[in-house]
Structure formats: C-alpha cells, structure tokens
A protein has these predicted regions:
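N-terminal helix-loop segment corresponding to the beta1-alpha1 unit
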Residues: 1-174
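Acidic, glycine-rich segments within the central catalytic cores of soluble metabolic enzymes
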Residues: 125-236
C-alpha cells in the first residue's frame, strides 16, 4: 500500500518479485485473468520484474536500478537485505541520494525484532486491539489498522519528508518504520487515559469508545445498523 500511494501520486514504481512463486498476493482470493483482484488493486500503476537477489546477476540488476532511483522500499525482517548485499549502506554507496525505507513488524532491534507477525499481532501489542469491541470481549476488526497506518501512511510520510531533504541536501536517509510503534504512537486517547488515571480506558466505555448514547451503533428494526455521532449538543 505504501508504494501504491506513491504510484498513485505519479511515482514510477518498479516492483521486484522473486523468480519462483512471485508475490503470493497474485493468488489471494478470487482471480480476474492471471492474478487475483486483490493483487490488481494494490499493484495498479506499477511495473514489475522478477529477480533472484541471492544470485550475483540479480543483485547487479538491483544495484543498477538503485543507482538511478530516488526511493527504495523493502519489507524483509531486519538484516535480510544486508545479507543479500543490498542493505542501506550498500545501496547508499552507489546512490548517496537514495531514500531507503524499511518496514518491519517490531523495528530493527529489540527482543521482538526477528519475529514475524500480522495486523492482529501489531494492534494487540500496541494496546489498540484491547480498545476495540464491547465490555464483554474484543473483536477482530475487518480493517487492517496496523498494515495501513504503520505499513503505508507512516512510511509514505517519512519517505516524502526524506525525499524533500534529499533533493535539497543531496543526502538520502534510511527511513525505519516499525508497524507496531506507528500504531502505538497514534493511540492518543489510550495514552491520555493512562497518563491521567494510571490505566487505559475500559473497552466499550468513554466518549469515543461506546460509552455514550450519542456516539454509538444501534440495531434497527429492519436488521441493519445505524451509526450515531452527535457528541455536540447542537447535533443531538
């Protein structure tokens, strides 16, 4: 999604896939033609090539691409790109202006750095998962909060800021984004509750969490649901 936003804004995005299975998203869900609908949606406006980065020839192609690029985005676990000879220092040596963005689950170091994860893990560790649902139990949101906030919007913001600086200073940067950290940084009301009261807000309570009748969801007679958002008296 991060590179999709860049592509939609006009960037020439070249997506690199491995030479065997390629991007597994090609087979995710119903297909339309040779690839899944999901794959086509998130890879619109992109070009694609297949490279085996474990082979010298594949690495050489990547280095040539990086030499003429402004941005590189990678989503491997920490250290993988460096082992392939394509870490930030390797590519900065051939293109000092390169903005190199790494998107990981839990950051480049720390006790969880090498762990894999999915959206549900990231929002759980960040405390957001505990805030979604009713007093009885949390729910699994059918909207990937961490993947989109931490894996797309936060990286794009960092990339664009670094790109502006690189164009004026001539020096690129390593933009390091941990999806769990990005979610936690945006959990403002959760943090406010903890700092003010020493505990996080109860699930299904509070002004924006379902504790008020003027900001809630109600089942209607015809079996649908109605969202009411009238916090201010003038709207009620």
């Amino acid at each position: 999604m991060a590179t999709l936003h860049l592509a939609d804004m006009g960037a020439d995005v070249v997506k690199i896939e491995d030479t065997e299975a390629g991007d597994y998203a090609r087979a995710m869900g119903p297909a339309r033609g040779r690839s899944s609908v999901f794959f086509q949606l998130v890879n619109r406006n992109k070009r694609a090539i297949r490279l085996d980065l474990k082979q010298p020839q594949g690495r050489e192609v990547l280095l040539r691409l990086a030499k003429g690029a402004e941005i590189l985005v990678e989503g491997f676990r920490p250290g993988v790109m460096a082992k392939l000879g394509a870490g930030y220092n390797d590519l900065a040596a051939v293109n000092p202006r390169l903005v190199y963005c790494s998107i990981t689950s839990y950051g480049q170091d720390g006790p969880y750095a090498d762990r894999a994860g999915h959206d549900i893990n990231y929002i759980g560790y960040a405390g957001v998962g505990d805030q979604i649902g009713t007093e009885e139990a949390p729910v699994v949101p059918n909207f990937q909060i961490a993947d989109l906030l931490g894996g797309a919007l936060t990286p794009v913001m960092g990339i664009l800021a670094a790109l502006i600086d690189a164009r004026s200073s001539g020096r690129g940067r390593h933009v390091d984004v941990a999806m769990t950290d990005a979610v936690f940084a945006h959990a403002i009301l959760l943090l406010v509750g903890f700092l003010e009261h020493g505990k996080t807000p109860g699930r299904g309570t509070g002004m924006l969490g379902g504790g008020l009748p003027c900001y809630n969801v109600y089942r209607t007679r015809d079996g649908r649901y109605m969202a009411v958002g009238a916090l201010e008296r003038k709207f009620w």
